[in-house]
Swiss-Prot record:
UniProt keywords, alphabetically: ATP-binding, DNA-binding, Metal-binding, Nucleotide-binding, Repressor, Transcription, Transcription regulation, Zinc, Zinc-finger
Gene name, Swiss-Prot/TrEMBL: nrdR
Chain segments carrying region Disordered: 1-22
Function (record text): Negatively regulates transcription of bacterial ribonucleotide reductase nrd genes and operons by binding to NrdR-boxes.
Protein family per UniProt: Belongs to the NrdR family.
Protein name from the UniProt record: Transcriptional repressor NrdR
ZnF unnamed: positions: 3-34
The organism of origin for this protein: Deinococcus geothermalis (strain DSM 11300 / CIP 105573 / AG-3a)
Gene Ontology MF annotations: ATP binding; DNA binding; zinc ion binding
HAMAP family given in the database record: NrdR
Span of domain ATP-cone: 49-136
Upper lineage: Bacteria, Thermotogati, Deinococcota, Deinococci, Deinococcales
Length: 150
């Protein structure tokens, strides 16, 4: 490992231990030239979850983008922001695939929001399903009411 102080190419590991609940390894190193110590972290690099968009393009999954949509849907609603954050940042771990459609992300987000708050659910659904008329809102609300009576 290259020394950050003198750029020497060689160092020795003085101490090594798990970090971040075992998700990475913290190593204390000592430069063999200048004898200064520095810390490095080693983490497995996984292939990113790819999102297949409606237009056919592909992009890496971004939990911040999902979180923004959830926050907008739940704005001024009695929903714990930590629940939203946990869902968005845990989403990639829950998906057992290398690729997912944006439609599936939307479906899963709606499934997550439904028991939390009806208004947030409708807000998210209106964007995800691209409601273009008042009738679409009414249909969705009636569907919610029908499921609530089961």
């Amino acid at each position: 490992m290259k020394c950050p102080y003198c750029s020497a190419p060689d160092s020795r590991v003085v101490n090594s231990r798990p970090s971040d609940d075992g998700a990475s390894i913290r190593r204390r190193r000592e430069c063999l030239r200048c004898n200064r110590r520095f810390t490095t972290y080693e983490r497995a690099q996984l292939e990113p979850l790819m999102v297949l968009k409606r237009g056919g393009q592909r992009e890496a999954f971004n939990p911040d983008k999902l979180l923004r949509g959830l926050i907008l849907a739940t704005e001024k609603r009695p929903v714990d922001p930590e629940q939203l954050r946990a869902f968005a940042y845990g989403f990639e771990d829950e998906v057992q695939a290398s690729e997912i459609t944006s439609e599936e992300i939307g479906r899963r987000a709606m499934t997550f929001l439904r028991p939390l708050d009806d208004v947030a659910y409708i807000r998210f659904a209106s964007v995800y399903r691209d409601f273009d008329s008042l009738e679409r809102f009414i249909e969705e609300i009636q569907g919610l009411k029908g499921r609530g009576e089961d």
